[in-house]
Regions:
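A short His-aromatic
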Residues: 103-107
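Conserved N-terminal segment of class I S-adenosyl-L-methionine
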Residues: 1-94, 98-102, 112-115, 142, ...
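A short glycine-rich, Lys/Arg-flanked "PGG" loop and its adjoining helix->strand segment in the class I
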Residues: 112-124
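Short "lid" loop at the C-terminus of a central beta-strand within the Rossmann-like core
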Residues: 133-138, 172-176
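Class I S-adenosylmethionine-dependent transferase superfamily signal
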Residues: 50, 118, 159
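Conserved beta-strand signature within the Rossmann-like core of class I S-adenosyl-L-methionine
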Residues: 125-132
């Protein structure tokens, strides 16, 4: 599958890759030995990650092309793909232990229907792991595929309308140093460029995405995690490489023009006409010198 901006594909690199892989690696910690549903499974890479430890994973996507691609690439004894909508999931009641739904909610206007369907296919003590962009921060980027983005309060309220317990985490790609504690909310420290002062704020207030665990039974404990994504694959590095390549092209073009001028000049110096007119140029030089003395 090719990247269109609607569904992530594994050949993508940069921040988008770090975000998507981190979410699925995080979710894989809750699916060991479980029956799992991956809503909006897309290319299938995430469903495949979950299937490494789950008893069985069903990926559901509305796109026939995505389902066909994922089936051909990933299907096996513990993984299957079905075509269907998040608002009308093609599974029976209480069919799965865990539902994973990453970056799907904001693509639908029928968000209450989606949560109702997730609740229907989950077992009574089942777990939902779901993510969505943080509207106040993400909307600045613009996304033509998003129908209804949510702020923190709206996201939590929607989940609590269907589930008794909700636990919220934040996600944001950063390059820096991580100090991880054993409890409490993560504190984000940022030094202001204008005066060097240090700003202190809760990480979830600055997160670009929210990831929530929801269920009607006790929720499993969560730990902060850091996905060590190579800096050389970051968006910044890619932009610097692009700028460097452009500068190299300009340098090569300028060098080629200089060499062409030098070659033309050398050709002129070696030409018969240049050699034949050499006495005239010397005479003109002498006459010019005498004129200056007078």
């Amino acid at each position: 599958m090719e990247f269109t901006g609607e569904r992530f594909v594994p050949q993508c690199q940069g921040e988008i890759a770090a975000e998507h892989y981190h979410r699925y690696f995080f979710a894989s910690g809750f699916v060991a030995g479980k029956r799992v549903l991956d809503i909006a499974s897309g290319e299938g890479y995430g469903t495949h990650i979950l299937a490494q430890s789950a008893a069985h994973v069903t990926g559901v996507d509305i796109s026939p092309e995505a389902v066909a691609n994922a089936t051909q690439k990933y299907a096996g004894d513990r993984i299957a793909f079905l075509q269907g909508s998040a608002a009308t999931i093609p599974l029976p009641d209480a069919a799965v232990d865990v539902v994973v739904s990453f970056e799907t909610l904001e693509h639908l206007s029928e968000q209450e229907d989606m949560l109702g369907e997730i609740r229907r296919v989950l077992r009574q003590d089942g777990l939902l792991v779901i993510s969505t962009p943080n509207k106040p921060l993400y909307s600045r980027q613009g996304d033509n595929f998003h129908v209804k983005e949510l702020c923190r309060e709206e996201f939590v309220a929607l989940l609590k309308s269907r589930f008794a317990h909700v636990s919220l985490l934040g996600q944001k790609v950063m390059y820096g140093s991580l100090l991880s504690g054993t409890g409490g909310e993560t504190l984000l420290l940022r030094q202001r460029e204008e005066d060097g002062a240090v700003e202190r704020m809760l990480f979830t207030e600055q997160a670009r995405y929210f990831i929530a665990l929801a269920g009607n039974g006790p929720l499993p404990p969560t730990q902060s995690s850091f996905f060590d994504y190579p800096l050389e694959k970051s968006d910044l590095t890619a932009q610097l490489r692009e700028n460097l390549a452009e500068l190299q092209e300009r340098h090569d073009a300028a060098q080629a023009r200089l060499e062409a001028v030098e070659a033309a000049y050398t050709a002129i110096l070696a030409s018969r006409s240049w050699l034949a007119t050499a006495p005239l140029r010397r005479l003109r030089h002498l006459l010019k010198g005498k004129g200056n003395k007078s």
